[in-house]
């Protein structure tokens, strides 16, 4: 088979055009979740958290440090974050002699272990969707006074 000069040029031109066509840039990598550091402590030897309201953006990785600010009383404290409307039910369901929260409870978003006075602990969790999420101390009798709100907003 004999190729004409015109056919050869047409074939070369089409190959060049095929390699020169516009290519879409690769998709941008997904942004890593934002990390937010929050600090909360028990208010000395009182049954209260300071602050009693925390704020973070939805989807953020939250690194929460809880400090037991007590100096004299030996009561242990923790921090338990639950779904809206679930604080009382979760508080009633904990093992009340120790105030321990079940890690398998779907109503619980995050919690710290119990801390003795002067101790600190850091936990990490993904912020839930927008809304107000209650938190409390699950030591028996503390939840009524020792509670607050994590306000999750679309963006800070």
Roles of regions detected by a PLM:
Residues 46, 99-109:
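Short beta-strand and strand-turn-strand segments in soluble, beta-rich domains
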Residues 45-50, 72-77, 88-90:
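Short, solvent-exposed loop/turn elements at domain surfaces
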Residues 7-22:
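N-terminal export signals
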Residues 78-82:
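Beta-strand signatures of extracellular beta-sandwich domains
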Residues 66-68:
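Asparagine-centered strand-capping/turn motif at beta-strand->loop junctions
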Residues 33-59:
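N-terminal edge beta-strand
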Residues 20-43, 85-101, 126, 140-156:
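Extracytoplasmic/periplasmic copper-protein system
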Residues 71, 106-156:
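Extracellular/periplasmic metallocenter environments
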